[in-house]
UniProtKB/Swiss-Prot annotation:
PANTHER family reported in the protein's UniProt record: 30S 40S RIBOSOMAL PROTEIN (PTHR11831), SMALL RIBOSOMAL SUBUNIT PROTEIN US4M (PTHR11831:SF4)
Protein family according to the UniProt entry: Belongs to the universal ribosomal protein uS4 family.
Any single Gene Ontology cellular-component annotation: small ribosomal subunit
Annotated SMART domains: Ribosomal_S4, S4
CDD domains in alphabetical order: S4
Molecular-function GO terms, alphabetical: rRNA binding; structural constituent of ribosome
Pfam families in UniProt: Ribosomal_S4, S4
GO aspect biological process, one term: translation
Limits of the S4 RNA-binding domain: 94-157
Source organism of the structure: Methylobacillus flagellatus (strain ATCC 51484 / DSM 6875 / VKM B-1610 / KT)
Protein name according to UniProt: Small ribosomal subunit protein uS4
């Protein structure tokens, strides 16, 4: 399954939650599920499988991943010493495209991914183009001097979509972000029951 490129607000309405990595829009104005009259303005009670699928989809859509990419991260998370769910969330937050987004360089993770793939992003002073790089403590993230003048960057730095998390320190003068410490599960900027995601993949890997 490839990355989603359809209507983002429709996805968030279906999941019943705002996903800041997917879109700056919110479902506040249209909170009902998509469909004729919002399925009579009600949300049917989901089955256990439906709940697990919904929590998994929150992660996949917010971080802009294909099913294959998310499965691969789950495999890696299982190898860690910490609880699988916590490790999965940390791996997601540590992706370079997410860090570029959380640092305030881009309005969404998709936009941050474009900055990376087009080589606007510098990691420890070197140009990189791989969005899935996992940052480590002490890593420094910045943009090329010419890239800081891009309209999307200027606008987002002036009006960031989210408050920068504590695990990312920020140097205003140099416009450089630094990984102060590794992110924790509570640093994920939307509610998700990650244990449901772990259970979803329990018999699928």
């Amino acid at each position: 399954m490839s990355r989603f490129t359809g209507p983002r607000l429709k996805v968030m309405r279906a999941l019943g939650i705002d996903l800041p990595g997917l879109s700056r829009k919110t479902i506040e104005a249209r909170p009902t599920p998509p469909g004729q009259h919002g399925a009579k303005n009600t949300r049917r009670k989901k089955s256990d499988f439906g709940v697990k699928l919904q929590e998994k989809q929150k992660l996949r859509f917010n971080y802009g991943l294909s099913e294959k990419q998310l499965r691969r991260l789950m495999v890696d998370a299982r190898k860690g010493k910490s609880p699988t769910g916590e490790t999965l969330l940390q791996l997601l937050e540590r992706r370079l495209d997410n860090v570029v987004f959380r640092a305030g360089f881009a309005p969404t993770i998709a936009a941050a991914r474009q900055l990376v793939t087009h080589r606007h992003v510098m990691l420890n002073g070197k140009s990189v183009n791989i969005p899935s790089i996992r940052v480590r403590v002490g890593d420094e993230i910045s943009l090329k001097a010419s890239s800081t003048k891009l309209p999307i960057v200027v606008e987002t730095l002036a009006n960031p979509p989210l408050t920068r998390p504590e695990w990312i320190s920020w140097a205003e003068q140099s416009q450089q972000a630094k990984v102060a410490h590794l992110p924790a599960a509570e640093d994920v900027p939307f509610p998700v029951d990650v244990q449901q995601v772990v259970e979803y993949y329990a018999n699928r890997l």
